[in-house]
């Protein structure tokens, strides 16, 4: 006969929703078998009880056998073979129904006993195991719930031991009960065939014995058919016995192997933490807020599917989307005095979930898995190898290198295969300066023991006025474009360039140099290494607004400006050469009251887009600002030239007016002189007028030369 559908006993300890769904199918099949066998039992019982109704009962039996093919068994894998067999039985029984007599003893032994035994023993055993399993499952859920509520701050060894022992006992009981329940359901598939065929075989044998003299109704073909059925029943029984023995052995092996797993927090030395996972599944407690200060915790089955975190409640056929974890952030948190809690925040910061793992191993594996998925490692050809390589790079970044060259070759693609002098050829416009920079020590770039700031200072902090002063006045004093003081707000609003990017702040630290991109690379390495050492996963998300005047970090929820970086103070910016989502820039500000005391701070960010786009946007803003400044200078120069020309024009007009007045005065003097005056008087008047005219002419020439 075809293969028998079986429940996987090996998956009973995991107790996943898929296993529970498959169990529901088997339970539905057992219910269908029970209903059908009850009808068949009633039909055969009528044969046994009532001699007078034997014919009618036989006819009903034949009818039920014919209707077997119309039954819908969820696990009816061999319906065609069984239907054809029962159809043939139905025909024979229908032919013999008119001449059957009551043979109560033979029918009781050969027909009623097997089906009664199946009904009273096997089916009741299934019902009993189902009830026991349900009780064990409820006890296990209650024990897990009590264990999850253990206080981390007020830890009591006695209470913890009792709760842990309770979890161990309930989990062991549930596992053992579930394995035996699965075994009984698997065995039921064999017993179903036996319970169907063996009573029929006994019934026919009783009829053969009764009608031994009626050989005309019992030909050789029928005997051959019955013999084949008997052989099939024996084969099914032997197969069942072998399978039962195998399942019992599997149960024993699993009980021994699964004993350490009954503990909710297994020994980490025996079960090491795998940090290279890109897929994970298991039960987690999810925190759901029910009010302003109240919340509930629901235990659900969570699993990752690509870049999505899925959840599935017990009894559901399939899981549903819980959160998109691409580009998300995950970190361990303390929540309601519960252990092993972690928080997942979506890439846009609008959705977050707090989950609780069952053990420390699950807690760290979930955080590492979600962190790997957030980096989209699962999209590569070999996700686990890529995750292992990334984690190994993080560990190497934490380990100090003996030289500056070795520290930065790990950050450059193909850096290990190039000779040490290859860096000087890729320096671009820096020329020979990169050769000198390669020989510098680490202290020449970043001061030793420099503190790292992992969070953004709020605008309402006490340091903000001084910081604004450093960014504002200090930036204008060192402005390379020569901008004059003015309203920053109006300049930002009138800016030609407005580009907005979503970034997450990784950290900032003071640097000692700001003339080479290696400063940014080294700062990235130290900040990432510090985050890895201290297990800092939280990042502050902001909107980075790039304009022609400044860079602004804006709170995405309140739209409040967190920090403002004047564009002239941004003297250097670069992108990580391997992880293009990482970028940073160096800000040169006034470090104190003295304008000559300047300090440089390097800020590192992670973006959803490529960091090169943000750096290109900053470069474009600087170019636009430079051209705007050049245009402003040219405009001011042109205005100055026009003012000089206008002044000269006014002087010339004034000179012409003076000359015109002199000429008019001369005409008046000439007209007023009399021709009959004495020569001396005429000479005196003429000499006086000439002297006055000459004085005025000299004065006009002097003014003209001055103009």
UniProtKB/Swiss-Prot annotation:
Family matches, as CDD domains: BAR-PH_APPL, BAR_APPL1, PTB_APPL
What is known about its processing and modification?
Phosphorylation at Ser-410 by PKA severely impairs binding to OCRL.
**PID domain residues:** 495-655
Q: Which GO terms describe its molecular function?
A: beta-tubulin binding; phosphatidylinositol binding; phosphatidylserine binding; protein homodimerization activity; protein kinase B binding; protein-containing complex binding
Q: In which tissues is it expressed?
A: Expressed in insulin-target tissues including skeletal muscle, liver, fat, and brain.
Give the UniProt keywords, A-Z: Cell cycle, Cell projection, Coiled coil, Cytoplasm, Cytoplasmic vesicle, Endosome, Membrane, Nucleus, Phosphoprotein
Q: Where in the cell is it found?
A: Early endosome membrane; Nucleus; Cytoplasm; Endosome
Q: Which residues carry this modification: Phosphothreonine?
A: 399
- List each copy of the BAR domain by range: 3-268
Tell me one GO biological process term: regulation of G1/S transition of mitotic cell cycle
User: What SUPFAM superfamilies does this protein's entry cite?
Assistant: BAR/IMD domain-like, PH domain-like
Q: Which InterPro entries match?
A: AH/BAR_dom_sf, BAR_dom, DP13A/B, DP13A_BAR, PH-like_dom_sf, PH_domain, PH_DP13A/B, PTB/PI_dom
Domain PH: from-to ranges: 277-375
Note down the stretches annotated as region Disordered.
397-433, 466-490, 636-707
Say which domain of life the source belongs to: Eukaryota
Tell me the function of this protein. Answer: Multifunctional adapter protein that binds to various membrane receptors, nuclear factors and signaling proteins to regulate many processes, such as cell proliferation, immune response, endosomal trafficking and cell metabolism. Regulates signaling pathway leading to cell proliferation through interaction with RAB5A and subunits of the NuRD/MeCP1 complex. Functions as a positive regulator of innate immune response via activation of AKT1 signaling pathway by forming a complex with APPL1 and PIK3R1. Inhibits Fc-gamma receptor-mediated phagocytosis through PI3K/Akt signaling in macrophages.
Fill in the subunit field for this protein.
Answer: Homodimer. Binds RAB5A/Rab5 through an N-terminal domain. This interaction is essential for its recruitment to endosomal membranes as well as its role in cell proliferation. Binds DCC and the catalytic domain of the inactive form of AKT2 through its PID domain. Binds PIK3CA and subunits of the NuRD/MeCP1 complex. Interacts with OCRL and INPP5B. Interacts with NTRK2. Interacts with APPL2; interaction is independent of follicle stimulating hormone stimulation; interaction is decreased by adiponectin in a time-dependent manner. Forms a complex with APPL2 and RUVBL2.
Q: What is known of its domains?
A: Overexpression of an N-terminal domain (residues 1-319) or a C-terminal region (residues 273-707) has a proapoptotic effect.
Please give the name of this protein: DCC-interacting protein 13-alpha
């Amino acid at each position: 006969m075809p293969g028998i559908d079986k429940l996987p006993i090996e998956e009973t300890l995991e107790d996943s929703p898929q296993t529970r769904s498959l169990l529901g199918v088997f339970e539905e099949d057992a219910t269908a078998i029970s209903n059908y066998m009850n009808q068949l039992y009633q039909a055969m019982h009528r044969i046994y009880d009532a001699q007078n109704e034997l014919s009618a009962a036989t006819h009903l039996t034949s009818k039920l056998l014919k209707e077997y093919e119309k039954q819908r068994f969820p696990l009816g894998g061999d319906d065609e073979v069984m239907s054809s067999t029962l159809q043939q039985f139905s025909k024979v029984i229908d032919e013999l129904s008119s001449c059957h007599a009551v043979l109560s003893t033979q029918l009781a032994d050969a027909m009623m006993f097997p089906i009664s035994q199946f009904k009273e023993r096997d089916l009741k055993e299934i019902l009993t195991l189902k009830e026991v399993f349900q009780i064990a499952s409820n006890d296990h859920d209650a024990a897990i719930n009590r264990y999850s509520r253990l206080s981390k701050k007020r830890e009591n060894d006695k209470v913890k031991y009792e709760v842990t022992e309770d979890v161990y006992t309930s989990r062991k009981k549930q596992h053992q009960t579930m394995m035996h329940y699965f075994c009984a359901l698997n065995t039921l598939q064999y017993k179903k065939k036996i319970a169907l065929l063996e009573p029929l075989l006994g019934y026919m044998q009783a009829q053969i014995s009764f009608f031994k003299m009626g050989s005309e109704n019992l030909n050789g073909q029928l005997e051959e058919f019955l013999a084949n059925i008997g052989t099939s029943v024996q084969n099914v029984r032997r197969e069942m016995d072998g399978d039962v023995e195998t399942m019992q052995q599997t149960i024993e092996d699993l009980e021994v192997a699964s004993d350490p797993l009954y503990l909710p927090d297994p020994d980490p030395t025996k079960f090491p933490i795998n940090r290279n996972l890109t897929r994970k599944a298991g039960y987690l407690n999810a925190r759901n807020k029910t009010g302003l200060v109240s919340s509930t915790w629901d235990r659900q089955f969570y699993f990752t599917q690509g870049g999505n975190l899925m959840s599935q409640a017990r009894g559901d056929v399939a899981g549903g989307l819980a959160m998109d974890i691409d580009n998300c952030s995950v970190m361990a948190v303390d929540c309601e005095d519960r252990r092993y809690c972690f928080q997942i925040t979506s890439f846009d910061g609008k959705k977050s979930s707090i989950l609780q793992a069952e053990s420390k191993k699950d807690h760290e594996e979930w955080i590492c898995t979600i962190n790997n998925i957030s980096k989209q490692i699962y999209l590569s050809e070999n996700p686990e190898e890529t995750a292992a390589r990334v984690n190994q790079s993080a560990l190497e970044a934490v380990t100090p290198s003996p030289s500056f060259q070795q520290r930065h070759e790990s950050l450059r693609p193909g850096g290990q295969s190039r000779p040490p002098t290859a860096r000087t050829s890729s320096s671009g416009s820096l020329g020979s300066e990169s050769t000198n920079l390669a020989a510098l020590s680490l202290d020449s770039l970043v001061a030793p023991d420099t503190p790292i700031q992992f969070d953004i200072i709020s605008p309402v902090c006490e340091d903000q006025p001084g910081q604004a002063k450093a960014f504002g006045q200090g930036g204008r004093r060192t402005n390379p474009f020569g901008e004059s003081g003015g309203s920053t707000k109006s300049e930002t609003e009138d800016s030609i360039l407005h580009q907005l990017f979503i970034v997450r702040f990784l950290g900032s630290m003071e640097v000692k140099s700001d003339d080479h991109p290696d400063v940014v690379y080294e700062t990235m390495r130290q900040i990432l290494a510090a985050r890895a050492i201290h297990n800092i996963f939280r990042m502050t998300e902001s909107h980075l607004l790039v304009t022609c005047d400044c860079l602004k970090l804006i709170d995405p929820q309140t739209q409040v400006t967190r920090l403002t970086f004047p564009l002239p103070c941004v003297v250097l910016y670069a992108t990580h050469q391997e992880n293009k989502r990482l970028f940073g820039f160096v800000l040169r500000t006034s470090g104190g009251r003295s304008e000559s005391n300047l300090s440089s701070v390097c800020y590192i960010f992670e973006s959803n887009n490529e960091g090169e786009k943000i750096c290109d946007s900053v470069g474009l803003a600087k170019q636009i600002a430079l051209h705007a400044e050049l245009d402003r200078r040219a405009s001011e120069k042109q205005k100055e030239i026009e003012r000089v020309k206008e002044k000269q024009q006014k002087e010339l007009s004034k000179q012409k007016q003076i000359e015109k007045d002199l000429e008019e005065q001369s005409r008046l003097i000439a007209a007023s002189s009399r021709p009959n005056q004495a020569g001396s008087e005429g000479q005196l008047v003429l000499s006086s007028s000439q002297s006055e005219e000459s004085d005025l002419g000299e004065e006009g020439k002097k003014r003209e030369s001055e103009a």
